[in-house]
């Protein structure tokens, strides 16, 4: 497993854990249900680089189904949903206050997430 800690300009931290089949986003504390992190190019590049390594046929593309939309994911361990949206940064809702997990990407959700981030970079909304 690969793990990297990223810090935004407000000193908030995200822990990215990469394993054989998914990419997880964590915080340092379990009690944070809502969490915001400033999106930056370093995070984007790391996520895309790792996605290409985990999923050999990784191709960013628009969400074309509910399963491809990264807005919501189901966490089997807590039997609850977590949420992610891009609005003035990344806004996470953890599935449970008993876990540090904020979000877990599968291949298709990561493809649509990276596609949306690339669109923002193209419009120069992210620096």
Which residues are covered by each model-predicted region?
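Positively charged, low-complexity terminal tracts
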Residues: 1-127
């Amino acid at each position: 497993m690969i793990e990297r800690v990223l810090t935004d300009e407000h000193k908030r931290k995200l822990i990215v854990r990469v394993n054989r089949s998914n990419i997880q986003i964590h915080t340092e504390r379990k009690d944070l249900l809502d969490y915001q992190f400033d999106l930056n190019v370093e995070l984007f590049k790391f996520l895309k680089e790792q996605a290409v390594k985990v999923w050999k046929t990784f191709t960013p593309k628009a969400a074309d189904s509910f399963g491809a939309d990264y807005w919501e994911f189901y966490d089997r361990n807590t039997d609850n949903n977590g949420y992610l949206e891009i609005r003035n940064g990344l806004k996470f809702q953890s599935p449970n206050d008993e876990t540090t997990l904020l979000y877990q990407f599968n291949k298709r959700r990561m493809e649509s997430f990276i596609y949306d981030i690339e669109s923002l970079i193209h419009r120069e909304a992210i620096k």
